[in-house]
Each structure stands twice: as structure tokens, then as C-alpha cells.
Amino acid sequence: MSDKDNKTVGRRNLLTNLGVTAVAGLAGAAVATPARAAQSAGFEPARHGNDAWLGELAGSHRVFIDSSTLEGGANALRFASNIIKSHIDEYEGKASDYAMVVCFRHGSASYGFGDALWAKYPAILGRGIDPAPTSNPMSTANAANGQNSIDSMVKDGVHFAICKRSSRRIAAGIAEATGVTPEEAFAEIVAGAIPNAHFVAAGVLAATRAQEYSYSLLYSE
């Protein structure tokens, strides 16, 4: 056999071996993929009483809008309204079709506090806003929130997740400024929260737990 013939046979053997390997790989993938799918389908997240309210909100669609800044908190109202109005206009739906949660955490946490608290502690709650407002800026429909407000959101059935860790940080500032204990200040915050408020262990934690209850997650900037 000539050198040319030897090279031809060698190439054929190589291609044959590669073909066998590829088929074996595809067969392995065909076997492994259903196994992985079954593993994923079999996952059931642990349930906790603190999160039960997420599963109790009525609606055929679930959305969790997260925010962590003053601007993001205002836009969260805008986005919640846009979703609901678009659903009504384009899908012939209604606001009650949505289990909608807006999260105020970190820099937007004080939006979860009612007007009486803002009137009492404007410099603390309005930190970063000049001049410091004496009522919750989200109590009024304005350009920042797309002409929506806390009350208009509540009328549409929207609920609010308020970060407890951020609220406790603010309570510590109130305690330092007024001489009450941090626990007393935090209790006042909880009592003076906006309607439909749920104080969650941490806003970031609530955002992850909401997804375990099949909420779509949107971050508002």
C-alpha cells in the first residue's frame, strides 16, 4: 500500500472514531438532560410563615418591583401603574388581576412611612432631599412618580414590602436624636407605616423569596 493510501485509510479511521464519539456524546446528553430536568422540577423551596403573605395575595399575575434609591422608589410606582394600565388597555384586564408588590429598601425605605412620621422627623426621613419634605413625597402624584401616589397604588391593590433592616437603621437615628430607645422608635415606625405595608426581614431577602412564590422580578432605578 502506498503512503497516499495509508494516509487515506488513517483519515477514514479518524473520522469514524470521531463520529462514534459524537454519537456517544449525544446519547449521553439525551440521557442526562431529562435527569437534570427532573431534578429541577422536583425542587420545592422551604416555606416560612414570615413569607406567607406573598402567597396569599390574589391575582393571576405576580410582580415584585424592587427599589433601593429615592429615584428608584418613585419610579417603582410609575412602573407598577404602567404594568396595570397596559394590562387593562391592551389585554382587557383589570387591576385585580395582579398580585403587585413594590419594595422600599435601603435608600427608598422611608417611602414606606406615613405622613405623620415625615412631619415629625423630616430631617431624618428626608435625608438626601433638599429641602426636607414634611410629608411622604410619594403621598402626592407628581412628575417623579409618573403622576401616581401611594393612595392610587393602594386603590389598584398594590402592596408594599418595607425593609425591616433599613427601618431599624432609621429608628436608631430617631432614637439618637430624640432620646427614646431604638425599639420604641421602630415600634412608632411600624405603627405609622403606609397602607398595605408588610415589614420584611430584609428587602433583598423578600426579593428572592418572592421569586420562590412565582413573582416576576423587576428592579426600579
What are these regions (language model features)?
Residues 9-31:
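N-terminal export leaders
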Residues 29-61:
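C-terminal segment of N-terminal export signals and the immediately downstream linker at the start
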Residues 54-70, 127-129:
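Acidic/histidine-rich, surface-exposed loop or edge segments in extracytoplasmic proteins
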Residues 93-117:
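Acidic helix-start/capping segments at beta-turn-to-alpha-helix junctions
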Residues 116-139:
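A charged helix-plus-loop insertion that forms the helical arch/lid used to bind
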